[in-house]
């Protein structure tokens, strides 16, 4: 039995304000808003729901896992070449298609020449190092360069030669799932009094 919910722009803006007011710390995942709306809708008919959030990461279903087989070849491309490609792609108007060639080239080039365990997260980031530097003030950047931030975010004990699906799965399980996906589904559902498993 399927149910359909439609939301108008006023409901979306009101929900955005509710989510913003309830968040006690930043969460950089914009999908919290549709997850909040879905949880609100589900709460009208159920008290407990099952979620598929995290399944692709757990079972290695996303593109970063498929790319693990190619990391050893991508590691041969120097970082400065990756920076040139990234800068060039940022100047070319983007296409709206999800996973378009423009999108893929721009994001993959961000990781070129960096340690393997950083590449995947650099690909996934909505911002290049240049974007990050442009957004933050010079005093902050002088103390915390984007490279230093990446080094601090990713655990130092992760082997710099990480290139296997198993290692990527460990990284996702230790960092991405608990700090993004699972936090998002937990907050969005609990804000509506819905238990999600």
What are these regions (language model features)?
Residues 148-157:
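A short, charged helix-loop
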Residues 177:
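Globin-like tetrapyrrole-binding proteins
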